[in-house]
Amino acid sequence: KEFLYYMGTLSGLRKPHARIEQVIDQVGISQAANQRLKSFSGGMKQRVVIAQALLHDPPVLLVDEPTAGLDPAERVRFRNLLSELGRERTVLLSTHIVEDITATCRQATILNEGKVAFSGEIEKLVSSAQGKVWKAWVSPEQFESVQSAHTIVYSRPTSQPGLIEIKFLTKESQPPFESEPVTPTIEDAYLLLIPTGNADEKQSENII
């Protein structure tokens, strides 16, 4: 509470005590309101930051990589909080974590090298990958060939010696080897939309 009172006073908030009670209840930290910040978990500290942002009841809330560094349980709780806040205001979420988008967003904008590569409904983005996502079981030799021609989403060993299970992307209507179609995900659609390259070269890409 002391931190929020301090920040509220600095920002010219009138009657900060009443508003602070509202926001700490809204973000779910009422029971810990009188504890020291240094005792909070990463997720709790994120909630305090959101509470600070809500002090003046803004119509738009911009959050950047809000779940980075959180454990899975904290991440789920924080996503639910963002979804709740989105019912009353516009929440702009900037993140590289695909699960954050599918769990909290209805629309997405994908930036590639500072330019908009896609903007629209999540469902439209995912549907654009329909018929382009496949699964196959290949030998190590075949894997090298597939990898050179297609984007590999994942590869993992199987219980059968000499076989590798792969999920890959292709813009061909039918791969030239035995494969099964797979229901696309937002990650698949993203990888089809953005040309693949060295992972270090892709750090500038973002999803909002």
Explain the meaning of each model-derived region:
Residues 5, 9-32:
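Conserved ABC ATPase "signature" region
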Residues 61-65:
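Catalytic Walker B motif of ABC-type/P-loop ATPase nucleotide-binding domains
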Residues 36-40:
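Conserved ABC ATPase signature
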Residues 78-168:
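ABC transporter nucleotide-binding domain
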Residues 57:
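Conserved catalytic motifs of ABC-family nucleotide-binding domains
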